[in-house]
Amino acid sequence: MQNLPSAGPLPAPLAARLVALLAVLAVALGFAAPAQAQLQLRIGGGSFQPMPIAIADFGGDPSLGGLVSGVVTNNLRRSGYFTPLDHARFPEQPNFDAAPNFEKWRATGVQGLVTGRVSRDPSGKLKVEFRLWDVTSGQQMTGQQYGTDTANARRTGHLISDAVYTKITGLGPWFDSRIAFVDESGPKENRRKRLMVMDQDGANVRAITSGETSIVAPRYSPATQDIAFMSQATGHQPRVQVINLETGARQALGNVDSMSASPRFSPDGRRLVMSVQQGGNADIVTMDIATKAQHSGTNGMAIDTSPTYAPDGSQIAFESDRGGSQQVYVMGADGSNPHRITFGAGSASQPAWSPRGDLIAYTRQRNGGFAICVSKPDGTGERVLTEGYHNEGPTFAPNGQYVLFFRDPGGQGGGKLFMVDITGKVEQPIPTPSYASDPTWSPLLAGR
């Protein structure tokens, strides 16, 4: 977002000045509040219940206030970890400048309450404020204010969602991010495939390519505003290309006479790792984007493809049929010590390394079905997140808590996007204008 400075802390209203004083001391002195006064939701391997929470309509400007609070409500509901209270059950419309009537709110069963206000300064800039209240303890848990342009009101809702989500769950933010994907339209035998980008909730969709060439396997850079993808024009070899989302500049990489595919950026965004066809086999190759210097990571008779960097850049996971079937392997970033990490029934392909570094997601095909699975980088602890027909293309959210993928039921239809959390207990559809495949999740936009 342009003209969106870092959020500043927002003090509690005067009606709660004693609580505010304690909160300030807790921050300044590292004082730990009693456990029962903490608004927390711990997400783990066991069962959990979504937290009941109320998100009040933001006061001030009625149209923009409703827009921002609506974004927050939708985000928290879609996360699977919160159940927003229906406004018809609200006991009051909270006054942003006063403490809520906690006794009334406790009677509704909610544990958290979000209040806010949208106003304009003399120059016409927006000021968006919010507070998160712990209804049980009557404490303000956090509060911030943002200054921005009117056009950025919706994105401010994503930033507020992240602040609430991280405060309560202890997990990293992810709402202030985007998704790129391949938009598919037209008859199945002659699909037009365009690169599109949208907010993670499906809003603000825009086409990046025209559809004159077929687009496959886009991937965001972790460090720049670039997306790498495979592009194929009729009668030509598929080529890896990189496009900058800010300038629209586009460049082709790889050898003209060789098919290059499955590009992935290094964590610093300076290199690409890809699969390059060499005769009847395909090898993993890294390329310096600036100098175009190449280094072979694998060199053999197998089909090695779909490489993905560990977030620290020290290792690469990839897919290979060197053992007789498609499986996931891990090697050093310099190509050293390649070793298989997936075993058991069926094949495993399309690995994606979590930005937290703790998990690798992949597609496992077995018994006629396609499962999205995760395991530790050494292959232990495999678990199935979701299973069905043609679940493919896993990619992690910026906080590593959700996996985005596409599901194609077959026939004359096409794929649709879904996300599932790493516990496998939350699965949500992601709206797209048409059929969609090959999603990739951006890093957080804040500070970019």
Enumerate the language-model features and the residues they cover.
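Bacterial N-terminal signal peptides
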Residues: 19-30
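Short beta-strand->alpha-helix linker/helix-N-cap micro-motif
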Residues: 43-103, 114-118
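Residue-level detector of Asp-centered blade-edge/turn motifs that repeat once per structural unit
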Residues: 173-175, 222-223, 267-268, 311-312, ...
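Hydrophobic beta-strand positions that form the internal "hydrophobic ladder"
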Residues: 179, 227-228, 269-272, 313-317, ...
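Multi-bladed beta-propeller domains
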Residues: 199-214, 243-261, 287-305, 331-347, ...
